């Protein structure tokens, strides 16, 4: 295991530019791959476990995305973490409804997401509400990306949860 980092809890494969180019993001530039590699190494993120993604559409700059599970797994290991609730905000008829989870019917519109993160010793949870309009991933033509079109509730719930985790634990998640 020459250049591999292995621990009881986390296995890190050897990552290099060729591996990233071949298996993760063939369209990425050398600079984008280098930055992605450095982030993965510094944060101990394994892209093969979907802890980090390098995403590139057309000629736009690549985007580095840290997977939601990375945040929830790491939060669970923090001594002050006491749980979370997260859900979506839907327009149901003429009413705004806050719903836990990501379920909604075809007659409802997902407007946003919300999350609360509970921290031991803190009376009030860290709470965020986010708008789909602000965060929805879009293609060059302005239409939603496949994930946002197919899993709108799940995606906006993740955004709200990650924001709340970052605010609750800025030292662990970089604010």
PLM region spans:
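Glycine-rich anion-binding surface patch
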Residues: 1-175
């Amino acid at each position: 295991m020459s250049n591999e980092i292995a621990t009881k809890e986390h296995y890190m494969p050897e990552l290099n530019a060729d591996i990233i180019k071949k298996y993760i993001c063939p369209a990425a530039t050398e600079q984008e791959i280098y930055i992605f590699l450095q982030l993965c190494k510094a944060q101990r993120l394994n892209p093969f476990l979907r802890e980090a993604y390098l995403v590139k559409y057309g000629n736009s700059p690549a985007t580095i995305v840290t997977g939601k599970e990375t945040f929830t797994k790491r939060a669970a290991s923090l001594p002050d973490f006491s749980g979370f609730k997260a859900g979506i905000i839907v327009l149901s008829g003429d009413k705004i409804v806050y719903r836990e989870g990501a379920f909604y019917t075809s007659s409802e519109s997902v407007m946003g997401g919300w999350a609360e993160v509970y921290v031991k010793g803190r009376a009030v949870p860290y709470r965020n509400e986010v708008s789909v309009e602000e965060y929805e991933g879009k293609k060059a033509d302005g239409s939603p990306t496949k994930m946002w079109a197919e899993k709108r509730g799940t995606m906006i719930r993740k955004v709200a949860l990650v924001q709340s985790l970052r605010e609750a634990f800025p030292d662990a998640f970089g604010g």
